[in-house]
Amino acid sequence: MTAQTPIHVYSEIGKLKKVLLHRPGKEIENLMPDYLERLLFDDIPFLEDAQKEHDAFAQALRDEGIEVLYLETLAAESLVTPEIREAFIDEYLSEANIRGRATKKAIRELLMAIEDNQELIEKTMAGVQKSELPEIPASEKGLTDLVESSYPFAIDPMPNLYFTRDPFATIGTGVSLNHMFSETRNRETLYGKYIFTHHPIYGGGKVPMVYDRNETTRIEGGDELVLSKDVLAVGISQRTDAASIEKLLVNIFKQNLGFKKVLAFEFANNRKFMHLDTVFTMVDYDKFTIHPEIEGDLRVYSVTYDNEELHIVEEKGDLADLLAANLGVEKVDLIRCGGDNLVAAGREQWNDGSNTLTIAPGVVVVYNRNTITNAILESKGLKLIKIHGSELVRGRGGPRCMSMPFEREDI
């Protein structure tokens, strides 16, 4: 990394030097059973314990010499002038689907009154309950304000924010600022926009943009993997479509970030396998975790770029052989989540046994609860850093989902 390139990520396994997290906040306490599906949750984590688990995760990374950054802090540091701060508030409000002009005005006044930038950022993440707003005089209400909904929020919370992998993805020295699958999560990308536009270190054009949140097709960071300095992997999944991948790849190749080929993985389109990194992660030079249930239906395409055109070939051979050839290793070991036991594989994949964070070649952060997968990984010679995640896992994401590398050593 240099002063001109504050982002440097050319692998999934190079020694991790700097990483972005988001400590779960009050947005988690704004989950309620009636609206879990709307907010893309299956259950409600207990915030106090989720924070303890997340703090332990962050400390485990620090203990390995990794600098931990926080999304909420970088976003606050990006509001460098009163004008930028006000522009952020107005853009946040314009994307918040607020019902009623008077309600929007009341929320703007509430946010403008918050003096501390980090408190402001955390409030925008938490959402706004209608009960927090002053009673609006009938004479000021528009029709939308008068037709009162029983929905308790004036602005939805963003409970998925602790999965920092998805709103944007670091690729080489650039960043893909994503357009996300759902309206609920697409608002999360606003923080990345302000960080990479205005932050003293990461803003001001220092980081090339290879995808923009204003695109109309969807892509999420869980489907963007950097296998080596030459090869990327992308998932065509429930959350990422092929049109987005084509746009991303053209931009990456045109901006000369150094990548020569992309492997596009097409697999089952459902919540259980929402991203590529929930079923497939790299843990060493020649080792990957994989969920066995995707192997039969998996299709892989090789994509290269020449004469300003993408060239796409469907790969017909064995996946392990394909990966070995593209990574320049003799053989690749695909380590099955849950081993060969169908029940264990299903249970441990649901609990993110395949969603590992590699912090150095062969050194992997995992949830301790996935005992069968962990035992297999250890039998393959991998060093595991095991963290508790009984509350964090309720959001359906593991250590890779909860982290966004900003700097890795080259391999």
Swiss-Prot record:
SUPFAM superfamilies (UniProt xref): Pentein
Active-site residues from the entry: C401
Pfam family, one: ADI
Enzyme type, top EC level: hydrolase
A molecular-function term among this protein's GO annotations: arginine deiminase activity
Transmembrane regions: none
Disulfide bonds listed in the record: none
Pathway: Amino-acid degradation; L-arginine degradation via ADI pathway; carbamoyl phosphate from L-arginine: step 1/2
Entry EC number(s): 3.5.3.6
Alphabetical UniProt keywords: Arginine metabolism, Cytoplasm, Glycoprotein, Hydrolase
PTM comment, free text: Glycosylated.
Main location: cytoplasm
One BP term from GO: arginine deiminase pathway
Gene Ontology cellular component terms for the protein in this record: cytoplasm
Family that this chain belongs to: Belongs to the arginine deiminase family.
Protein's UniProt name: Arginine deiminase
